[in-house]
UniProtKB/Swiss-Prot annotation:
This is 2,3-bisphosphoglycerate-dependent phosphoglycerate mutase. GO terms for biological process: gluconeogenesis; glycolytic process. The gene is gpmA. Substrate binds at residues 8-15, 21-22, 60, 87-90, 98, 114-115, 183-184. The lineage of its organism: Bacteria, Bacillati, Bacillota, Bacilli, Lactobacillales. Belongs to the phosphoglycerate mutase family. BPG-dependent PGAM subfamily.
Length: 230
């Protein structure tokens, strides 16, 4: 039996301000920093020992991963970063206050953009200050694969190869894995792991804290699923 632990990053400065974040590289808030540390303490108390860890290339997830592993006294655990674990790209909504977006586009439209499985938000302009096309961390990627907007369906399509190439093989090899990522990239992987329908995943929320644990058998069937508690 192996353990897969998902930790959504702690509260970010833009979470706190109620802004659409997506691929914008926003830092943790003071509360978010503490949530990451507390996540690590829960992991230590639960006696979970990791063999490797994965995170995105966005600082809020990277810092959460490092802080949690440090608090769990496992900072030595190898960490691999991948853009495939990034948050869903919110396109032209990035940086907008969610309440202001609702006032501008209407509550129903914004709700559809946020919660529909396969409806895309407006695309981000190539010259937007948060465009990934000019960001050095994505320079190794073909420009055609860098998104300008994503829904959960596209987020899953982007994250799934990383699951199949990196995470799943490690679990099948008997390794315990920590994944420090984002609300929607985790939701996408949870949809795959639990084989949820497009409608079922819409009701799934991943909190900033505490971490979510899956205990899996050798075929990666779920034996147990739970959130860590103090």
């Amino acid at each position: 039996m192996v353990k897969l632990v998902f930790a959504r990053h702690g509260e970010s400065e833009w979470n706190k301000a109620n802004l659409f974040t997506g691929w914008a590289d926003v830092d943790l808030s003071e509360k978010g920093t503490q949530q990451a540390i507390d996540a690590g303490k829960l992991i230590k108390e639960a006696g979970i020992e990791f063999d490797l860890a994965f995170t995105s290339v966005l600082k809020r997830a990277i810092k959460t991963t490092n802080l949690a592993l440090e608090a769990a006294d496992q900072l030595w655990v190898p960490v691999e970063k991948s853009w495939r674990l990034n948050e869903r790209h919110y396109g032209g909504l990035t940086g907008l206050n969610k309440a202001e977006a609702a006032a501008e586009f209407g509550d129903e439209q914004v709700h559809i953009w946020r919660r529909s499985y396969d409806t895309l938000p407006p695309e981000m302009a190539k010259d937007h200050e948060h465009s990934a096309h000019t960001d050095r961390r994505y320079a190794h990627l073909d420009d055609s694969v860098i998104p300008d907007a994503e829904n959960l369906k596209v987020t899953l399509e982007r994250a799934l190869p990383f699951w199949e190439d990196k995470i799943a093989p490690a679990l099948k090899d008997g390794k315990n894995v920590f994944v420090g990522a984002h609300g929607n990239s985790i939701r996408a992987l949870v949809k795959h792991i639990k084989q949820l329908s497009d409608d079922e995943i819409m009701d799934v929320e991943i909190p900033n804290f505490p971490p979510l644990v899956f205990e899996l058998d050798e075929n990666l069937n779920i034996v147990k699923e739970y959130y860590l508690e103090a």
